[in-house]
Design a protein with these regions (language model features):
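Basic, Lys/Arg-enriched alpha-helical interface segments
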Residues: 1-67, 76-82, 87, 91-95
Length: 95
């Protein structure tokens, strides 16, 4: 088993979004797989369309878990912390 590079932190908003995703019966294992890759410092597959955000979310990154299910996260390099900020649809996060 690979050792993680980053300590994973969850925001209160992410915890709430995670519970909402569970209630919607979204495939949580896909989210967990992405979190695992990020925690190990591995690049995400191209299908996840990982990219930097701008505007209010500058300093954060976004990737697609599914076409309209996103994960917003931030990597704080100095302290090696992966902060999971939000998860949800485009409309929920940016609408």
């Amino acid at each position: 088993m690979s050792e993680t590079k980053y300590t994973v932190k969850f925001t209160a908003a992410f915890r709430k979004d995670y519970k909402k995703a569970q209630k919607r019966r979204l495939p949580i294992e896909k989210l967990q797989e992405i979190i695992g890759l990020l925690a190990m410092g591995e690049p995400l597959p191209e299908r996840n369309r990982d990219h930097a955000l701008t505007g209010d979310w500058v300093g954060h990154r976004e990737c697609h878990i599914q076409p309209d299910w996103l994960l917003i996260y931030r990597i704080e390099g100095d302290v090696l912390v992966l902060t999971l900020a939000r998860t949800g649809t485009h409309g929920e996060l940016f609408g």
